Structures are given as C-alpha cells and as structure tokens.
C-alpha cells in the first residue's frame, strides 16, 4: 500500500484525561478475564494494543472511578465485538452475522442468551448493571444509540453481499453510529448531577453537536485505520470510498477527508453556541443548564482526546497481521461465535 502523510489535525479544545485511569484499567482487565473476552493470547494482545482503557479515559475524563470503570467495560466489550466482526469474520456470512447481532440486541431487552456466546452474556449482565436505577428515558436513548451501532455491522455486510457501491453521504449517515460515540456520550450522563432533560437531549443543537463530534472522531479514525482496514479487506472507510469514487491517490483522498474533519470542527463550534441559545430559550433550572453545558464541553474535549489516543496506541498498526496470517498462529475464538 502506498505511503501517506497523516494531516496535522487542529483541535482547539483542551485535552482532558481521567485521573482514575490506572485503577479503572485494572478493574477492566479483571472483568475481561472473568467474562472470557480475551480467551487467546492473540485476542489479549489485540486488546492491549487497542488501549481501550486509554480511549475511555479520554471519553469520560470527568467521571468518578465507578463511572469510569463501567465505561471501560463497555468500551472493551465493543472493541472485542468490532474485532470479531470486522477482522475475524472474513467470510462475511450475512445470515450468521444477522443472527449474532440480533442476539446482542436482544440482550438489551432481557432476552435469553445462548450458552456459547460469552460476549452476549457479558453484554446482558453489563446492561443490567448499567441500567439499574436509571431513568427510563435515558435507558431508551442509550438502547436506541447502541442498537444503531450494532445495526451498522449488518448493514455493511448486506451492502458487501449485494456488491453495492458505497456513497459517501450514505456512509457518513451510518458512520455517526458505527464509531460508537452517541452511546458513549449517553454514558457520560451518569456522572452529571442530573440526567439531561429530554428537551435538551433531543433538541436540534444537541443533535447537531452529537453528529458533528461523532463524525469528527470517525473521520480521524478513518485516516489512522485506512492501511490496516485495506489489508484486511474492509472497505467502509471514507478515505477508501473517496479514492475509489474519484480515482485519486491515497494522499489526495486523505487530504479530502482532512477537509471534512475541519468542517465537522466548525460545526461543533457552531452547535455549542446554538445550544447555549437554546438553553436560554428553554429557561431551564440552573442545575439542568449546568449539566447540559458540562456535557457539551465534554463532547468537545473528546475531539482532542481521541486524536491523542489514535496517535498513541497500536490498534491500527499492521505488523501483527502477518503473524495472524501464519497457519501456525493461535486463532482468535470465533468467526461470529461472539
């Protein structure tokens, strides 16, 4: 694959990292081991190289230890799901993928889990722990965003199975959810003094902020991950879509994605200002307003944090792919045993 230069992404927001990272990381690994989520050395090494704990410390920099620990469990679990589907399921058997995703979705609604699925069992138990005592409106918002995240795996497999060409606009609509940020930011509400009022959680400026922030992080991810994803045959990447649609060089496609990243940054700035105006219009009690402003500031800080995370970890390095292709290598556990 041709070499390319990663753009110098500019993000004006302060970098925040959770001071409880070390202690929460230990708890995360204990939970991974207890639930059998890294059953082989290869799977364990992949989790180490991912730095799920560091990513979570940047997602929830203001959370207390207990909230951060819950968050790290979620982020580790979903990185494991992502690896099992995007890299281990090379055959992309659509019916099997649909069955696996349906089982994961069912756990969020209390449906029984098959005995052979450690990931689904862990998801069901983690959701029960997370949802306990939470408002129904928050639970509904989280489930909606998490199901949208899971659905992207089935949608992508369906597009591949039918040989459908990938359009950038359609991809971006999906990418907002496949990157996972909307439900990750739902979890950020757990550390606020009060949950966001429904009128704030679903208002236009908040939706605009959430989408632009998610796409900023997603498009940065596409640049950092394009080499690895190309090598494993994964085509759902903005760089790849632009390159194939325009017949341009890899560097030209990367530079075009950088322009899209900058546009999302401007939208984040605009949406934060519009949110302040919307909060004035709603005339909320001071605690609700403060919670909304705090939540929005955390979304902005995530742009800086996730950029640093991408630059710091080996999740998107490619040196492990050659050893994984060796027939003597230890397999990861499933091709959709999830």
Curated annotation (Swiss-Prot):
The lineage of its organism: Bacteria, Bacillati, Actinomycetota, Actinomycetes, Kitasatosporales. It catalyses: (2E,6E)-farnesyl diphosphate + H2O = (2Z,6E)-hedycaryol + diphosphate. Mg(2+) 2 binds at residue 87. Changing residue 309 to F/L/Y: No effect on synthase activity at pH 7 and 8.5. Its cofactor is Mg(2+). GO terms for molecular function: metal ion binding; terpene synthase activity. The record marks 149 as: Important for the cation stabilization at C-11. A motif (NXXXSXXXE motif) lies at residues 221-229. This is (2Z,6E)-hedycaryol synthase. Changing residue 310 to S: Loss of synthase activity. The 1,11-cyclization requires isomerization of (2E,6E)-farnesyl diphosphate (FPP) to nerolidyl diphosphate (NPP), the abstraction of the pyrophosphate from intermediate NPP leading to a (Z,E)-hedycaryl cation and finally an nucleophilic attack of a water molecule. Belongs to the terpene synthase family. Changing residue 149 to W: No effect on synthase activity at pH 7 and 8.5. The Asp-Asp-Xaa-Xaa-Xaa-Glu (DDXXXE) and Asn-Xaa-Xaa-Xaa-Ser-Xaa-Xaa-Xaa-Glu (NSE) motifs are important for the catalytic activity, presumably through binding to Mg(2+). It comes from Kitasatospora setae (strain ATCC 33774 / DSM 43861 / JCM 3304 / KCC A-0304 / NBRC 14216 / KM-6054) (Streptomyces setae).
């Amino acid at each position: 694959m041709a070499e390319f230069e990663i753009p110098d992404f500019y993000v004006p927001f302060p970098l925040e990292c959770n001071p409880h990272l070390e202690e929460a990381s230990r708890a995360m690994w204990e939970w991974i081991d207890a639930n059998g989520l890294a059953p082989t050395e290869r799977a364990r090494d992949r989790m180490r190289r991912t730095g799920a704990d560091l990513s979570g410390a940047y997602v929830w920099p203001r959370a207390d230890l207990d909230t951060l620990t819950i968050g790290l469990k979620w982020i580790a679990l979903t990185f494991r799901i992502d690896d099992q589907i995007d890299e281990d399921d090379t055959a992309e058997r659509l019916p099997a993928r649909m069955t696996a995703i349906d089982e994961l979705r069912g756990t969020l609604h209390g449906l029984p889990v098959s005995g052979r699925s450690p990931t689904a069992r862990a998801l069901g138990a983690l959701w029960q722990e997370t949802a306990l005592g939470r408002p129904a409106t928050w639970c509904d918002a989280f489930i909606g965003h998490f199901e949208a995240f899971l659905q992207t795996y089935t949608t992508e497999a369906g597009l591949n199975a039918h040989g459908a060409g990938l359009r950038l606009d359609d991809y971006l609509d999906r990418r907002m959810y496949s990157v996972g940020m909307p439900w990750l930011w739902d979890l950020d509400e757990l550390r606020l003094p009060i949950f966001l009022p429904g009128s704030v959680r679903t208002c236009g400026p908040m939706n605009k902020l959430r989408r632009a922030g998610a796409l900023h992080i997603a498009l940065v991810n596409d640049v950092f991950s394009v080499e690895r994803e190309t090598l494993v045959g994964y085509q759902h990447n903005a760089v790849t879509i632009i390159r194939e649609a325009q017949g341009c060089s890899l560097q030209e496609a990367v530079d075009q994605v950088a322009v899209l990243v900058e546009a999302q940054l401007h939208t984040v700035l605009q949406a934060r200002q519009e949110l302040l105006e919307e909060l004035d219009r709603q005339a909320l009690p001071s605690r609700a307003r403060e919670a909304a402003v705090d939540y929005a500031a955390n979304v902005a800080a995530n742009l800086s944090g996730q950029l640093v995370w991408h630059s710091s970890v080996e999740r998107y390095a490619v040196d492990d792919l050659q050893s994984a292709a060796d027939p003597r290598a230890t397999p990861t556990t499933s091709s959709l045993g999830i």
